[in-house]
Amino acid sequence: MRTFVRGTAVWGVECPQRPSRVAGVTMAGFRVSDLEALRIVPHPAVTLLVEFGAGSSVLDCAAGRQEWGSIVSGPGLGTGGAVRAWGKNVECVQIRLSPVIARAILGASPADLDGAVVSLGDLWGREASWIREQLGDVSSWQDRFELTDALLARRHETGPPVDPEVAWAWHRIVVSRGLTRVDRLAVEVGWSRKRLWSRFRSQLGLPPKRAVKLVRFDHAAHRLVAGEAAAQVAADTGYADQSHLHRDVMAFTGATPATVAGELFLAVDDIAWPGCG
């Protein structure tokens, strides 16, 4: 387990030695003794947090709402900068699901989340308690990843797939790092614009235009954390100018690009998921 230290924050981070058997699944393990007011930065994935240790975390969400323990969040959670995480002695496996496979694994459409947070137990019932107990019963992080991956694979096999056209459109957005022209997507899949927008939104949880913005922002944010100048990041990632980048970063995080460049969430992110940006 790698240790990441910044100021008083100490994080233990573990990564799987093998990729998931399900394309679109990535995982990391975390051990955090003191989690204090961590700003949640939006990410283009559905996130599952499975806690198993003695401690627990809490998410402070919009309008004073809180969620404790193991949770599921839709793509873009944290937009606007209002979501914070707190906790003591937290141990968890965090799973990121491509929205393309999220519906099959969750048993519900990401559209039902719409950037919000729900308890994992609300979606998985007894299976949520079962995986939490299993993770707590083993001492090896690699065994925890294997247990989690086996469960995800089983659920994926029996869950409903998204339309191939929707999966293809998402893939185009991701591989282009948000530089795809959304008006071309419908033409390229041979659907009407209305049909693609409706299917994309209902199956992946966000409309194509928002997906493009989120993927582009995610790539730009990780480059800012890597120390690149905002003007260069804006030029390289498809923003009209530095002011455009500034507005987008503010909209997604409630903070300036300079502040985002120092965000603990993103710094740890680059250790847990190297190359994700």
Stretches with model-predicted labels:
Residues Q203:
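Basic, nucleic-acid-binding surfaces and adjacent catalytic neighborhoods in DNA/RNA-processing proteins
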Residues F200, V212, V249, A261:
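DNA major-groove recognition helix of helix-turn-helix
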Residues M1-R193, L206-P207, H222-V225, A229-S243, ...:
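Alpha-helical bundle regulatory/interaction domains
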